Every structure is written in structure tokens, then in C-alpha cells.
């Protein structure tokens, strides 16, 4: 009799466990799908942003120096006052260049946030491109988060007429060079003090498995055809 009761109890426990797992899976699966859609949307918007920079003669320095950089961070939209307490931020992608082949890695996903962003053009949002100029820049991006200006140096890149005067590559000493525009105009966004952090959920969703930045940009252990156009755009622009 005791064995029968124990057997019934075990069945009930198993049933409850399966039910609980079913609920968890029901909530978890849409979350993964949503992250994957968000990640692909960011990649697509990053390509649009990149094209806007490399086609704009005022930002010729970006295009002309893509074959010198270690990597590139593209933030399709940094929103001023878009977060609690009026802080600003956005999410973007990092791609790293293979210096031997000129090919670009799959994208890794990052957020950027600060309470001090100021948009000189008066806009509420800006598109931002950050060129990772040194190995220290890449090493910083392999950590879970870091602060621009403290853990890695950053400078605003030359724009317009200043692009020619600032084109002397040996004079570049910053780890990151940033460029920003708002509604097609120069935004002059100062990113010093901003915190850049890994978006682990988006990385894993885009790669279809648990993936850290090192897995994506160092080990090349990630493959997604959704980034093909962005990679081709970068390689063509830098050739």
C-alpha cells in the first residue's frame, strides 16, 4: 500500500515538474525569438548607419581608415533622455577586422549608456560609429563592461574640412575614435564617461548558442548569414 502511495506521489511530482517546465519553455522560447529578432534588426540598422557615414563626404575619414582599424562599433541610435533619470544610451554591434584577410567578424552586441551625453545639433537621438583603433580597445571590449575615458581613451574624429588636417594616422593616440550625426548633421557627441557593456542575451540569441564576445570576435565560433551584407559593406568600403 505504501509503495502504491509513493508511486502516486512520484507521478504527481513528475506531472507538476513537466507542467512547470512547459510554462518555463512557453515563456522562454518567445524571449529567445524576440532577442534574435532584435539582434537581426540591429544588424540591419547598423548597415544602414554605416552606409550613411561612408557615403557622406564629411565623414570621409571613416571610410579612408577602415583598413587601419582593429574593429568598428556601430550604434544606429543613441537616445538622449531615453532611460531612467534622463540618462542616455543605445545598443549596437561590434565587428573586428582580420588584418591578414581584411574580412570582418560576425557582430557582437553591446550597449552604451551615460548621464552626460550632449547633442550639439539639438537632436534627441544620434547615430554613432566608434573605430577601435588599438589592441587595448579590443581588449576592453572583451571584458563585460568598461568606461570610456577611464579604461580606454576616446577622441572625437575629424569631420568635414578637419578630416584632411586630422588624417595623419601616426598622430592618432586614442584607443577609440568616435563619429556621430543627428538627423544627418554633425552631432558632436562626447562619449567620454560612457559605459560600454556586453549584451549577452543578444549575442547568444544571434549565434544560436551561449556566446561571449571572445567566442565571436576571437574564436570565430559564431555564424549567421544575417550579417553577410554588413560584412561585405565593410570590406568593400575599406578596400
What are these language model-derived features?
Residues 2-17:
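Bacterial N-terminal signal peptides that target proteins for export
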Residues 4-6, 24, 61:
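A general, composition-driven signal for non-globular sequence regions
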Residues 15-26:
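Bacterial N-terminal signal peptides
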Residues 25-33:
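Sec/Tat signal peptide C-region and signal peptidase I cleavage site
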Residues 34-239:
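Small-residue-enriched, tightly packed secondary-structure blocks
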Amino acid at each position: 500500500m505504501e509503495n502504491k502511495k509513493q508511486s502516486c506521489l512520484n507521478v504527481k511530482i513528475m506531472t507538476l515538474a513537466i507542467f512547470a517546465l512547459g510554462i518555463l519553455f512557453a515563456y522562454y522560447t518567445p524571449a529567445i525569438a524576440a532577442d534574435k529578432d532584435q539582434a537581426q534588426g540591429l544588424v540591419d540598422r547598423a548597415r544602414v548607419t554605416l552606409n550613411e557615414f561612408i557615403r557622406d563626404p564629411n565623414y570621409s575619414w571613416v571610410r579612408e581608415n577602415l583598413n587601419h582599424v582593429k574593429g568598428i562599433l556601430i550604434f544606429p541610435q543613441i537616445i538622449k533622455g531615453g532611460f531612467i533619470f534622463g540618462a542616455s544610451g543605445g545598443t549596437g554591434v561590434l565587428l573586428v577586422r582580420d588584418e591578414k584577410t581584411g574580412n570582418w567578424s560576425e557582430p557582437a552586441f553591446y550597449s552604451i549608456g551615460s548621464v552626460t551625453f550632449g547633442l550639439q545639433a539639438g537632436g534627441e537621438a544620434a547615430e554613432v560609429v566608434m573605430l577601435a583603433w588599438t589592441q587595448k580597445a579590443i581588449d576592453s571590449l572583451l571584458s563585460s563592461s568598461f568606461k570610456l575615458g577611464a579604461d580606454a581613451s576616446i577622441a572625437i574624429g575629424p569631420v568635414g574640412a578637419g578630416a584632411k588636417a586630422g588624417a595623419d594616422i601616426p598622430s592618432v593616440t586614442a584607443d577609440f575614435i568616435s563619429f556621430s550625426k543627428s538627423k544627418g548633421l554633425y552631432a558632436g557627441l562626447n562619449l567620454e564617461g560612457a559605459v560600454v557593456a556586453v549584451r549577452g542575451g543578444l549575442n547568444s540569441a544571434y549565434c544560436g548558442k551561449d556566446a561571449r564576445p571572445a567566442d565571436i570576435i576571437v574564436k570565430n565560433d559564431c555564424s549567421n548569414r544575417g550579417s553577410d551584407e554588413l560584412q561585405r559593406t565593410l570590406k568593400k568600403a575599406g578596400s
